[in-house]
A protein has these predicted regions:
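NAD(P)H-binding glycine-rich loop region in Rossmannoid oxidoreductase-like domains
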Residues: 34-90, 94, 100-102
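Active-site Tyr-X1-5-Lys
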Residues: 120-148
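Conserved glycine-rich Rossmann-like NAD(P)H-binding loop of the short-chain dehydrogenase/reductase
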Residues: 26-32
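NAD(P)-dependent short-chain dehydrogenase/reductase
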Residues: 140-189, 232-235
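Substrate-positioning beta->alpha
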Residues: 162-170, 183-206, 213-214, 228, ...
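Amphipathic terminal alpha-helices
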Residues: 288-334
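Mid/C-terminal beta-alpha module of Rossmann-like enzyme folds, strongest
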Residues: 204-263, 274, 279, 296, ...
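N-terminal Rossmann NAD(P)H-binding glycine-rich loop of SDR-like oxidoreductase domains
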Residues: 3-23
């Protein structure tokens, strides 16, 4: 099977690329060549997907069984992909987001039939618009699309809600005995999925004829509350977390991004029903528990000092919010 990834070297997609190559898939990566690619066996097509004429020339005369765009975020990019790829593939897979599901939810158990609506996050609304365009072109023109919605997925990032992502800040902060923020009272439920588990559900969808016209989320079945998540991160770093619980609304007052990140996503208890992906991919099961996966992630950061970057803005944000909250809290009569 001949497959083209637009992207393919990121936090989620690298694991998919590795699994695809291990299964003998003829994998091409379309990228700008700015990131070192450690994927033996993958072929590279150099180009910028935003330069449509350049890409049209690069794929002229080529046909791929599957094309996956890992880095499409707005409807205009979907329109471009429809123009570019309609005659070059039998399956186009769009990477959407599980953050598109209804917020606030009418039911905590989320399936692919859960309504799509997120008034808190423009990122999610753009992904919804992308899906709507793909569903329309599938219905009206038979464009062979499949939609996949990752949720909070990690490998080479630290998947906390506040304090880190592609940086080491939250770990450094814990190791130095500083306070960290957990939104709300830390008891809302959440699902975090390792990229290798995601890959085991994703790769079998490639070339799957019955997946055409369908949407899927692919997550772990492990539900943890946020206290457990931060405690697992601390345990993996061999420290204790000094948690300060702060209401999400209060946190969001300090940073517009947190409106979407918390109120439109991570502050909302969510339990994913993965029965659909298990029907289409018999035997799929996520096997990496978070306490084991996050230990691997921290070891990955600490293997190379250059990865252990500290973002001063993350420390400043946490210090600012904690100080303001503690002042308010202390002013309330006991």
């Amino acid at each position: 099977m001949k497959v083209l990834f637009i992207g393919g070297t990121g936090n989620i997609s690298s694991a998919v690329s590795r699994l695809a190559l291990s299964q003998g898939i003829d994998l091409y990566l379309l990228n700008r060549g700015k990131r070192r690619v450690d994927l033996p066996g993958a072929r590279t097509i150099l180009g910028d997907i935003n330069q449509e004429k350049e890409i049209a020339k690069a794929i002229d005369g080529k046909y791929f069984d599957v094309i996956v765009n890992w880095i499409a975020f707005v409807p205009g990019e979907i329109e471009r992909d429809i123009r570019l790829f309609r005659r070059h593939t039998s399956q186009y897979i769009f990477i959407s987001s599980a953050s598109i599901y209804q917020k606030p939810p009418s039911h905590p158990v989320v399936s692919e039939s859960t309504p799509l609506a997120n008034p808190f996050w423009q990122y999610s609304r753009d992904k919804i618009a992308c899906e709507e365009r793909l569903n329309r072109v599938y219905r009206e023109e038979g464009f062979p699309m499949t939609i996949v919605r990752p949720s909070h997925t990690y490998d080479t990032v630290i998947p906390v809600a506040i304090g880190s992502w592609d940086d080491y800040t939250i770990i450094d902060r814990m190791k130095n005995g500083k306070k960290i923020i957990v939104h709300g009272d830390g008891t809302s439920l959440w699902t975090i999925t390792h990229s290798e588990d995601f890959a085991r559900g994703f790769v079998p969808l490639m070339g799957h004829q019955q997946a055409i016209g369908q949407s899927f989320h692919i997550t772990s079945d492990e539900s943890l509350n946020w206290n457990q998540i931060y405690q697992a991160v601390a345990a993996a770093a061999d420290v204790e977390a000094k948690i300060v619980h702060i209401p999400s609304d209060f946190i969001a007052k300090f940073d517009e991004f947190q409106v979407g990140n918390l109120l439109g996503d991570k502050a909302v208890s969510t339990i994913f029903d993965n029965s659909k992906i298990k029907r289409f991919v018999p035997g799929y099961v996520a096997t990496i528990p978070f306490n084991a996966g996050i230990k691997r992630t921290i070891e990955w950061f600490e293997k190379e000092p250059s990865r252990m970057r500290i973002k001063p803005e993350n420390n400043h944000f946490m210090d600012q919010v904690i100080e303001a909250y503690e002042q308010v809290f202390e002013s309330v009569p006991s």
